[in-house]
Swiss-Prot record:
Sequence similarity: Belongs to the IF-1 family.
A cellular component term, taken from the record's GO annotations: cytosol
HAMAP family given in the database record: IF_1
Gene3D superfamilies: Nucleic acid-binding proteins
GO MF terms, alphabetically ordered: ribosome binding; rRNA binding; translation initiation factor activity
Stated name of the protein: Translation initiation factor IF-1
Functional note: One of the essential components for the initiation of protein synthesis. Stabilizes the binding of IF-2 and IF-3 on the 30S subunit to which N-formylmethionyl-tRNA(fMet) subsequently binds. Helps modulate mRNA selection, yielding the 30S pre-initiation complex (PIC). Upon addition of the 50S ribosomal subunit IF-1, IF-2 and IF-3 are released leaving the mature 70S translation initiation complex.
Domain of life according to the entry: Bacteria
Organism per entry: Halalkalibacterium halodurans (strain ATCC BAA-125 / DSM 18197 / FERM 7344 / JCM 9153 / C-125)
Membrane-spanning parts: none
Length: 72
């Protein structure tokens, strides 16, 4: 998948799930399942419920995404 094909949206973490997965509510109201990107995992950045995050979505499956940034 090419880097240009991703859709970047902002959302809020609702609940943590097992295996570094999170339920995220997007700004448009949709709820998706998101996992943590490798760089965030590598730098031990904690993601808690209520955090604002940026999520990358694939155009092929809009119900799953990757958390790429946590706002301070």
């Amino acid at each position: 998948m090419a880097k240009e094909d991703v859709i970047e949206v902002e959302g809020t973490v609702i609940e943590p799930l097992p295996n570094a997965m999170f339920r995220v509510e997007l700004e448009n109201g949709h709820k998706i399942l998101a996992h943590v990107s490798g760089k965030i995992r590598m730098h031990f950045i904690r993601i808690l419920p209520g955090d604002k995050v940026t999520v990358e979505l694939s155009p092929y499956d809009l119900t799953r995404g990757r958390i790429t940034y946590r706002y301070k």
